[in-house]
Amino acid sequence: MGFSVDCSECYSIEPDSSDITIYLTINHNYRSIPIIVYKDQVDDNRIEYIDTAYSSPYYLFVPVNQYYSVKAEYSADGKTTYAVDGDKLNTKHVSESCDVECWVVTGGVMDVRLKYE
């Protein structure tokens, strides 16, 4: 199956919302990062949420069974760099792996950390 289940993390009913996790570069050069979270792809321009992140990881509670994208804006020394990533936040019914009714949430992890500085 390739999917490991921790039965202690089960939901007894299918959740309708959960957290997406966004990893950002936060340091002395980049103390605050404007982010835009989109439903679907960034190019679809379906804005879900706009904020400024001051720590990483950044969590946002959103509806499940949806693809989300994030665009982070890094500005320093008059230069701006954008980082983009996306992932689907899913629910999965895995009761056959546990002794109880079990729903888990998978995905929803985005990494918009700078690869270089």
PLM features per residue range, with description:
Residues 3-117:
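First exposed extracellular module after export/assembly in secreted or surface-exposed proteins
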